Amino acid sequence: MTQLKQARKNIITPGMKAIAKIEGLPPEFICQGVADGNIVIPANKLRKNLKLCGIGKGLSTKVNANIGTSTDFGTVESEVEKLKMAEMAGADTIMDLSTGPKINSVRQSILKNTCLPLGTVPVYQAAVEAKDRYGAMVKMTADDLFSAIESQAKEGVDFVTVHCGVTRQVIDTFKGQGRLTDIVSRGGTFTAGWMVFHQAENPLYEHFDHLLDICREYDVTLSLGDGLRPGCIADATDRAQVAELLVLGELVKRAREAEVQVMVEGPGHVPLNQIEANIRLQKSVCEDAPFYVLGPLVTDIAPGYDHITGAIGGAVAAAAGADFLCYVTPAEHLSLPDVTDVRNGVIASRIAAHAADIVKGVNGAAERDRQMAIARKKLDWDSQLNLSLDPEHAKLTRDRFKTKGKACSMCGDFCAMELAEKHLGVSVSRC
């Protein structure tokens, strides 16, 4: 019985109780959210010792870290190292996006070495194996694709990105649209390429009920991928993107009817003035399903700093109602990320998530900032470091130019707070 089915029977599962405790909310709230489909708990029934994570309405904004090999770089060991860094930096979930050699070994090692929910894009495995077996990715069969999905579900994968909304009709809309960057989603490109080669409908759409059967058996959460997400801000919110979203809205309803948990993925590259509209559109079309966004990146001209462009967009998106941020690293658009890139990406997205949680009124979010203000007024450095989002980095930065007095090295003897306390009689009790 899936979490969704139990919630509809008003059964509060241990997982729902755990999420309620983490979020500081009543278990009944979590149960109702799962039943309504606006909260998901990605948790394959075969996973053991899983650190549960609730994603959706009324909960804190979550952050995902992508890792994985490419055809040119990456090993099992390198990806496990990135995994550990992502965990240390505070990621809530992990996705393995491997496309390189030993693709199965990488995924299995990640599963073995993490207690965080793990997501994948199964078409990557199917494409890699088809290239090895048949000489070309497009020669994979529908059975190959569903076999990859089922084998990963049996291993314990908690959520899968599937590009079900890339239909023949949507492809026609895309062709008529005219884009600067065409299709930038690998999964979307694999799917569209297969459809054109075979002159056939997307098997994930045509056989969506089969996909639901697999997910229901293992309680795998569906993450409906946006294969036609915009790859530059000039392509944002175009007809192709919206056409796919309309299909995803229909599939959300079918997944819920099948008692399968489902969330929806979103753009992408979006200028600041279009982000809120994108969130509102998705929430309306997809009936308040949890929204999982990549960034969004708000400008295209900052390679090497796209963790910042993604954090800017992520903060605006989450404040407007997005529930789940996929991190962006400084290596985006340039290379495979290394361990340092992973850390910086997670931290940047966590800052965005927290900033949005203050706006959302998430339990404890604003209070943490209030406590930081009090600690700063007191020049209480231990408390400031403990309250900081990245205590290790904060301590290293402070220790670079440590002064003799209580103030930091920026102001020294001219610390505004210390002078106000001394000469104006302004005490910390006013904070």
From Swiss-Prot:
Binding annotation for [4Fe-4S] cluster: C408, C411, C415
GO molecular function annotations of the record: 4 iron, 4 sulfur cluster binding; carbon-carbon lyase activity; zinc ion binding
Cofactor, how bound (note): Binds 1 [4Fe-4S] cluster per subunit. The cluster is coordinated with 3 cysteines and an exchangeable S-adenosyl-L-methionine.
Keywords attached to this entry: 4Fe-4S, Iron, Iron-sulfur, Lyase, Metal-binding, S-adenosyl-L-methionine, Thiamine biosynthesis, Zinc
GO biological process, one term: thiamine biosynthetic process
The organism's place on the tree of life at top rank: Bacteria
Pfam families the UniProt entry points to: ThiC_Rad_SAM
Reaction catalysis annotation: 5-amino-1-(5-phospho-beta-D-ribosyl)imidazole + S-adenosyl-L-methionine = 4-amino-2-methyl-5-(phosphooxymethyl)pyrimidine + CO + 5'-deoxyadenosine + formate + L-methionine + 3 H(+)
Iron-sulfur recorded as keyword: yes
Residue positions binding Zn(2+): H269, H333
Obligatory cofactor(s): [4Fe-4S] cluster
InterPro entries: ThiC, ThiC/Bza_core_dom, ThiC/BzaA/B
Pathway assigned in UniProt: Cofactor biosynthesis; thiamine diphosphate biosynthesis
Residues that coordinate or bind substrate: N66, M95, Y124, H163, S185, R186, G187, D226, G227, L228, R229, E265, Y292
Family, as annotated: Belongs to the ThiC family.
Protein name per its UniProtKB record: Phosphomethylpyrimidine synthase
Biological classification of the source: Bacteria, Bacillati, Chloroflexota, Dehalococcoidia, Dehalococcoidales
Gene name, Swiss-Prot/TrEMBL: thiC
